[in-house]
Amino acid sequence: MAGQAFRKFLPLFDRVLVERSAAETVTKGGIMLPEKSQGKVLQATVVAVGSGGKGKSGEIEPVSVKVGDKVLLPEYGGTKVVLDDKDYFLFRDSDILGKYVD
């Protein structure tokens, strides 16, 4: 997974640090997919979360995901963060489209 790299970075407020899942490079039938046809990876694993953001009433609202959750991301957005030569992405909690439930 993310190893120790994410421990060097703590998201603030309602920010969520995620590690995108690897794109499928081979079909179930064993056909290798070229990079152009793989599509954008929209699934990720949460590796760190902030403490939450201020709500309308001024109270701190906790982030809706926790470390280890599998989430669905928007096609565009997020801020790329490189930690120990590995790419992570920083999103606002409200930008995350949903989380996968086992």
Swiss-Prot record:
Ordered alphabetically, the record's keywords are:
Acetylation, Chaperone, Mitochondrion, Phosphoprotein, Stress response
Q: What residues bear N-acetylalanine in this entry?
A: 2
Task: Tell me which InterPro entries the record gives.
Answer: Chaperonin_GroES, Chaperonin_GroES_sf, Chaprnonin_Cpn10_CS, GroES-like_sf
- Molecular function terms, GO-annotated: ATP binding; protein folding chaperone; protein-folding chaperone binding
Is Phosphoprotein tagged as a keyword? yes
Modified positions (Phosphothreonine) are: 79
- Location(s) in or outside the cell: Mitochondrion matrix
What the record says about the induction of its expression is: By stress.
Where N6-malonyllysine occurs, the residues are 40, 54, 56
Phosphoserine: residues bearing it: 57
- N6-acetyllysine carried by residues: 8, 40, 56, 66, 70, 80, 86, 99
Q: Which GO terms describe its cellular component?
A: mitochondrial matrix; mitochondrion
Q: Which CDD domains does this one have? A: cpn10 (cd00320)
Sites bearing N6-succinyllysine, chain numbering: 28, 40, 54, 56, 66, 70, 80, 86
Report the protein's function: Co-chaperonin implicated in mitochondrial protein import and macromolecular assembly. Together with Hsp60, facilitates the correct folding of imported proteins. May also prevent misfolding and promote the refolding and proper assembly of unfolded polypeptides generated under stress conditions in the mitochondrial matrix. The functional units of these chaperonins consist of heptameric rings of the large subunit Hsp60, which function as a back-to-back double ring.
HAMAP family membership: CH10
* Subunit comment: Homoheptamer arranged in a ring structure. 2 heptameric Hsp10 rings interact with a Hsp60 tetradecamer in the structure of a back-to-back double heptameric ring to form the symmetrical football complex.
> What does the similarity note say?
Belongs to the GroES chaperonin family.
Q: Could you tell me which PANTHER family the record lists for this protein?
A: 10 KDA HEAT SHOCK PROTEIN (PTHR10772), 10 KDA HEAT SHOCK PROTEIN, MITOCHONDRIAL (PTHR10772:SF0)
What protein is this chain from?
10 kDa heat shock protein, mitochondrial
Which organism is this entry from? Mus musculus
